[in-house]
């Protein structure tokens, strides 16, 4: 019988270094002989592509609609018969996910009822609880500076450090609420990439 795989989620503000650390973690786990599937939200499915257009600031910004769309995209991400998270888990694969419902709580919670966003996700029958969530905590000003260096046009939630601070506060609030029910780790990612990687590997 194949041992069930695990879901490991990396979260944080845009510009916190998630992509770098996910790539490094993927390589590390593969070197240990594990099967690994690297994925992200929003997905590349139709709903996910529509969400990316919203985030690029080319469409309306109703937060309740965004929350519902992210939930729909997340459910397809989980249940898709060929590329869904459930399928990979059933094959014993470790799923590394760049963002999950924690991002919905933090981002859409800036302009909608954060408790409602949490409820529609956490009470959804098809939802999966990650085996580990790692939050890379970086100063919002640092994140904003990193984004400004690599993007000519910031996305919807990257426009100013004050908004990014509100998002960080939301992250810390919801992670504190969930810490007794879920396996959550907060890492100081103001450190260099090598130091952050060492911290992550203590928990994986």
Give the location of each predicted region.
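NTP-dependent small-molecule kinase module
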Residues: 2, 26, 141-204
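Hydrophobic anchor at the beta1->P-loop junction of P-loop NTPases
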Residues: 10
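Pre-Walker A (Motif I) flank of P-loop NTPase domains
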Residues: 3-7
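Conserved lysine of the Walker
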Residues: 18
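P-loop (Walker A) phosphate-binding loop of NTP-binding proteins
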Residues: 13
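A glycine- and Lys/Arg-enriched "phosphate-lid" helix/loop adjacent to the NTP-binding pocket
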Residues: 104-169
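Hydrophobic positions on the alpha1 helix immediately C-terminal to the Walker A/P-loop
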Residues: 21
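ATP-dependent small-molecule kinase phosphotransfer cores
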Residues: 32-119, 124-125
């Amino acid at each position: 019988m194949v041992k069930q795989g695990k879901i490991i989620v990396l979260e944080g503000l845009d510009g916190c270094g998630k992509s770098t650390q996910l790539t490094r973690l993927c390589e590390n786990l593969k070197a240990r002989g594990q099967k690994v599937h690297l994925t992200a939200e929003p997905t590349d499915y139709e709903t996910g592509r529509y969400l990316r257009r919203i985030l690029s600031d080319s469409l309306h910004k109703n937060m309740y609609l965004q929350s519902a769309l992210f939930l729909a995209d997340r459910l397809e991400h989980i249940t898709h018969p060929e590329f869904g998270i459930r399928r990979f888990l059933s094959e014993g694969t470790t799923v590394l996910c760049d963002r999950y419902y924690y991002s919905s709580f933090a981002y859409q919670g800036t302009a909608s009822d954060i408790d409602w966003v949490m409820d529609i996700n956490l009470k959804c029958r098809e939802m999966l609880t990650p085996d580990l969530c790692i939050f890379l905590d970086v100063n919002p000003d640092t994140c904003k500076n990193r984004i400004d260096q690599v993007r000519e046009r910031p996305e919807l939630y990257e426009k100013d450090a004050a908004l990014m601070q509100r998002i960080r506060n939301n992250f810390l609030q919801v992670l504190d609420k969930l810490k007794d029910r879920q396996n959550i780790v907060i890492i100081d990612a103001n450190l260099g990439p090598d130091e952050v990687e060492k911290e992550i590997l203590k928990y994986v």
